[in-house]
Design a protein with these regions (language model features):
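Double-stranded beta-helix
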Residues: 185-248
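Non-heme Fe(II)/2-oxoglutarate
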Residues: 2-4, 9-10, 16, 242, ...
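Conserved hydrophobic/aromatic beta-strand scaffold that supports enzyme active sites
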Residues: 71-73, 174-178, 230-232, 240-242, ...
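Short, conserved beta-strand element in jelly-roll/cupin
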Residues: 168-184, 266-270
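A short secondary-structure junction signal
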Residues: 144, 156-161, 173-174, 185-193, ...
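Short edge-strand/loop segments of extracellular domains
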Residues: 151, 192-199, 267-271
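Histidine-centered catalytic micro-motifs
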Residues: 160-167, 247-248, 252
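Non-heme Fe(II)-dependent double-stranded beta-helix
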Residues: 3-6, 10, 15-161
């Protein structure tokens, strides 16, 4: 159900329009990126952030996996640390809805600033920082964060468990940190690299309505007219994937043995380091806020007002 607040009518209109979209529409990809990068000002925001970078890029930044491949896997914390953080978050909490316009995303509320800092400090380690810096060529901020719980099922938990890209600016990243082990839940995520995703993108498959997505890699390859090879990530507790969600096709692997717990961070370019941006309150709350800014260029004024 769509919440009856000031954002509700716009959400409803967008959902109704998508019912009448064609299944395959190459123009749709162009229109989506034009909306976010040009009309909503995310390209201008990125340029501003890059101009203010005050540290050197890592060696080999142009050839970092996140840049060339579109995703990279890396351990970010020990299994013991992952278990401790999950226990700290889950104690005295019931599973709750995490996103205002989705009943399918459930998990734990992250309302304790101290606990949020522990989670982010453990996740955004030097290896992740080097990849993010190579991709953005600027500092970055945490746009939003969730700790989700996906129950085991024989069927896909949501349309996120079909092949898709996430609508949004081209220059954003997601970091998925798995807090329990693949052996416990049997879940994960599959990825196509940038080359394979681009081949599919040319067909107009990207950004179609959720019910028009496919779970089948073979069907996706038939649409693209080329062989596709997916990477199936079977994470250990404490492992993470950093990827370009707007450009890399991905599909959740439904857990079958037990619940899967994932900390998800959405990263955007920033003119200041992420800890400073977090302290200034530059993040949004998915429970109450729209997912994306109407005009990202206004972020500069918001930042100035919090520091002035």
């Amino acid at each position: 159900m769509i919440p009856l607040n000031r954002h509700g009518p716009g959400i409803l209109l967008r959902k109704l329009k998508r019912w009448f979209e064609p299944d395959l529409d190459p123009q749709r990809v162009i229109d989506v990126f034009d909306e976010f990068d040009r009309a909503r000002g995310y390209a201008d925001w990125q340029a501003l952030c890059r101009a203010r970078l005050g540290r050197a890029l890592p060696d080999g930044a142009d050839h970092a996996p996140i840049v060339e491949q579109g995703y990279t896997t890396l351990p970010v914390m020990s299994a013991g640390t992952a278990a401790e953080l999950l226990q700290a978050v889950g104690q005295d909490q019931e599973v709750a809805r995490l996103k205002r316009d989705s009943a399918k995303l459930e998990g734990y509320q992250l309302d304790d600033p101290g606990l949020v800092s522990r989670l982010l400090d453990a996740s955004l380690n030097p290896a992740v920082d080097a990849q993010a810096l190579s991709f953005f060529r600027s500092e970055y901020l945490v746009h939003w964060y969730t700790l989700s719980r996906t129950a085991p099922s024989r069927e896909p938990a949501s349309v996120s468990f079909r092949w898709h890209c996430d609508k949004g600016p081209q220059s954003h990243l997601k970091l998925l940190v798995y807090l329990n082990d693949y052996d416990e839940h049997g879940g994960g995520t599959s990825y196509l690299d940038l080359a394979g995703s681009t081949a599919v993108s040319r067909t107009g498959y990207m950004f179609a309505r959720g019910q028009r997505r496919t779970e089948s890699l073979e069907e996706l390859a038939a649409i693209a007219g080329t062989e596709l090879k997916a990477y199936d990530h079977h994470p250990r507790a404490g492992d993470a994937v950093l990827f370009q969600p707007a450009r890399v096709l991905h599909s959740g692997i439904t857990p079958t043995r037990g619940p899967r717990y994932v900390l998800t961070l959405c990263l955007l370019p920033s003119p200041v380091p992420w800890r400073e941006a977090l302290a200034l309150g530059m993040q949004i709350d998915l429970r109450t806020d729209p997912l994306w800014h109407e005009d990202a260029r206004l972020l500069e004024k918001r930042l100035a007002s919090t520091t002035g």
